Amino acid sequence: MNPERLQLKGMLAESKKNFRTLDTEASGLVILIRALLNPYEDIKNLDMDKVFVSVKRLKEITEEMQTLNEKIKKLESEFE
């Protein structure tokens, strides 16, 4: 296998690893946001600062995941 293909394979593996890490973090944030937005809690007692920070991070993660997904598809197409 030539060095360029090995490098491409390494980039693909790294991108997939990063995607899985972000996916795990996003899943954790969804659970956290659901817990913070407890529908049985009085609205005055909700910690909206934590909710805001968590939702903001979730948005950043989803944008990173979309970018990584496009990169992964591009790298996989180069193997064909």
Could you describe each region identified by the protein language model?
Residues 1, 8, 15-16, 44, ...:
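Generic cytosolic/nucleocytoplasmic N-terminal low-complexity/intrinsically disordered segments
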Residues 1-24, 56:
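Short, charge/polar-rich alpha-helical segments
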Residues 16, 25-27, 49, 66, ...:
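Intrinsically disordered, low-complexity regions of eukaryotic proteins
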Residues 20-55:
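Short E/K-rich amphipathic alpha-helical oligomerization segments
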Residues 32-35, 39, 64-80:
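Long amphipathic alpha-helical coiled-coil segments
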